[in-house]
């Protein structure tokens, strides 16, 4: 019985540490946001050789810009339509200073 209680306490402690490390309850600091992280990635053509016109969010210009995607792999900063890129990445949350 005590072993189960001890194990439960250890598991809850590990979960709390994991939650804090992932940005949850950061004491007023910005928390981790996967949408913003995706938009901060550089454009990634990937290893394939197709020439697919795609859009990526350029963190420096704060705009969605065109690039050629190879057709495989790449990353999440890769949108088929500029409207999708704008909707996901061009927002007040990203453009606000630190």
From Swiss-Prot:
- Which InterPro entries does its entry note? Kunitz_BPTI (IPR002223), Kunitz_BPTI_sf (IPR036880), Prtase_inh_Kunz-CS (IPR020901), TFPI/VKTCI-like (IPR050098)
Q: Determine the domain of life of the protein's source.
A: Eukaryota
- UniProt keyword annotation of Protease present: no
Cross-referenced SUPFAM superfamilies: BPTI-like
What tissues contain this protein?
Answer: Expressed by the venom gland.
| Alphabetic keyword roster | Disulfide bond, Protease inhibitor, Secreted, Serine protease inhibitor, Signal
Assigned GO CC terms: extracellular space
One protein family per Pfam:
Kunitz_BPTI
Q: Which PROSITE patterns match?
A: BPTI_KUNITZ_1, BPTI_KUNITZ_2
Q: Where is the BPTI/Kunitz inhibitor domain?
A: 39-89
Q: Which chain positions carry the site (Reactive bond for chymotrypsin)?
A: 49-50
The positions making up the signal sequence are 1-23
Is the keyword Nucleotide-binding assigned to this protein? Answer: no
The record's similarity note reads:
Belongs to the venom Kunitz-type family.
Q: Main role? A: Serine protease inhibitor.
Q: What is this protein called?
A: Kunitz-type serine protease inhibitor kunitoxin-Phi1
Q: Which organism is it from?
A: Philodryas olfersii
Q: What is the lineage of its organism?
A: Eukaryota, Metazoa, Chordata, Craniata, Vertebrata
């Amino acid at each position: 019985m005590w072993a189960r209680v001890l194990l439960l306490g250890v598991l809850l402690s590990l979960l709390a540490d994991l939650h804090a490390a992932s940005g949850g309850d950061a004491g007023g600091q910005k928390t981790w946001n996967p949408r913003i992280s995706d938009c901060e990635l550089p454009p990634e053509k990937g290893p394939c050789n197709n020439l697919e016109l795609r859009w990526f969010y350029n963190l420096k210009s704060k705009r969605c810009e065109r690039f050629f995607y190879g057709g495989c792999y790449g990353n999440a900063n890769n949108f088929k339509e500029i409207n999708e890129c704008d909707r996901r990445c061009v927002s007040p949350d990203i453009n606000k200073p630190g």
